[in-house]
Amino acid sequence: MLITSIEAHEILDSRGNPTVEAQVALENGTTGSAIVPSGASTGEKEAVELRDSDPKRYGGKGVLSAVANVNDSIAPEIIGMEVTDQRSIDRKMIEIDGTANKATLGANAILAVSMAVARTAALSLGLPLYRYLGGTNASLLPVPCMNVINGGKHADNTVDFQEFMIAPHNAPNFAEALRMGAETFHALKSILRGKGYSTGVGDEGGFAPDLKSNEEAVEVILLAIEKAGYRPGEDISICLDPATSEMWKDGKYLFFKSDQSTKTSEEMVDLWASWAGQYPIVSLEDGMGENDWEGWKMLTDRIGATVELVGDDLFCTNAKILAEGIEKGVANSILIKLNQIGSVSETLDTIELAVKHNYKCFVSHRSGETEDTTIADLTVATAAGQIKTGSGCRSERVAKFNQLLRIERQLGEAARFAGKSAFAR
């Protein structure tokens, strides 16, 4: 089915900042749309998110230039192409851009069209998006890793590390895992309130209290797991994303929100090894900075046999960078963010490379999200087994969980739940 029109518009994300929505229409009248997210803590090697830098509009964060690139540069070249030829469409947009990091058109322009094309193709064939992208065997529901305490760049508090997540893995299905996570989220709220802490939430829906230390964040989560009636490590484990690239200053890690202390790479590895021995941590994302490859190698050698070590800023969903990490024996898992690389095809290529080399894949939202649920379908399509998309509140986060509930119902008896094997080393 041929594409007859492509239109882009400027709309708002969950932080009130502009983002790009694209709509694709076909000759049979089918239409589909998609909206791109935006990150706060971003890797240096991410594809370029094009902003207008006009101080008179949205504080310089407008995306009218990216919208114009879709309507004026991309649409004329893509109209008339077969909507199911995702790879050719993505390749054409990359060729038009002409840069390695999509700096001309903007990854937000290219990805909006790429995602909208995939969704419209699925609709035209009468298929759910997960089935269209993943084929007949797509049936694995992920563990919902829920970000219940926010720190770092995601919250205005004294916690250095960015995300403290719960992973409810000992469940018979996704729906029950989500229930376990939501109950723990509410138990945590009760505990924080009882301790006199604020229960306001950060960008991703997690609480953002002024805790006394980073360790206290883990300890109150463990209390919440027990208060909700579950066993830490047996039913629900902990995933961390300290986002240490944001802490990397002058060759050391600066604890910039708490006590202003610093640690060397060796000391950070010691810290994570200590935490892994003390707490039920199944996954550690960006435990070292994106440019600290020696530190990453030390961390992988030290705890990589027992803990999932996820490269986010390190790899930026980029197959070429992942290949370098594989060759060097760095990390054992990769975070998947569509807008880090900027097209559906390239994202699928990166996932394929990771799976080929026994690296786990962990699909992720961004801190500036929307009601778009593409990543829920992508997670099932690729059998990733893990997704992080915020906490148990904020509708732009819950939208992804609700889509996964729908997918599980659609699959019926064919649905499988990843469980703790999603993190297994």
UniProtKB/Swiss-Prot annotation:
Per UniProt, subcellular location reads as:
Cytoplasm; Secreted; Cell surface
Q: Which gene encodes it?
A: eno
- Its protein name is Enolase
* Pfam short name (any one): Enolase_N
The cross-references to Gene3D superfamilies, in alphabetical order and at most eight, read: Enolase-like C-terminal domain (3.20.20.120), Enolase-like, N-terminal domain (3.30.390.10)
The record's annotation in InterPro entries points to: Enolase (IPR000941), Enolase-like_C_sf (IPR036849), Enolase-like_N (IPR029017), Enolase_C (IPR020810), Enolase_CS (IPR020809), Enolase_N (IPR020811)
User: What residues form the catalytic site here?
Assistant: E204, K337
Keyword Cytoplasm listed: yes
Q: Which residues bind Mg(2+)?
A: D241, E285, D312
| Co-factor requirement | Mg(2+)
Give me any GO biological process, just one. Answer: glycolytic process
Q: Does the keyword Acyltransferase apply?
A: no
**Biological role stated in the UniProt entry:** Catalyzes the reversible conversion of 2-phosphoglycerate (2-PG) into phosphoenolpyruvate (PEP). It is essential for the degradation of carbohydrates via glycolysis.
Q: Which PANTHER family did the record assign?
A: ENOLASE (PTHR11902:SF1)
**Can you provide one Gene Ontology molecular function annotated for this UniProt record?**
phosphopyruvate hydratase activity
What would be one Gene Ontology cellular-component term for the protein? Answer: extracellular region
How and how many cofactors are bound, per the record note?
Binds a second Mg(2+) ion via substrate during catalysis.
Binding of (2R)-2-phosphoglycerate, residues? Q162, K337, R366, S367, K388
Which stretches are tagged as biased composition: Basic and acidic residues? Answer: 43-54
* CDD domains for this protein: enolase
Q: Which reaction does it catalyse?
A: (2R)-2-phosphoglycerate = phosphoenolpyruvate + H2O
EC number(s) recorded for this UniProt protein: 4.2.1.11
Its main subcellular localisation, reduced to a broad class, is cytoplasm
Keywords in alphabetical order, please.
Cytoplasm, Glycolysis, Lyase, Magnesium, Metal-binding, Secreted
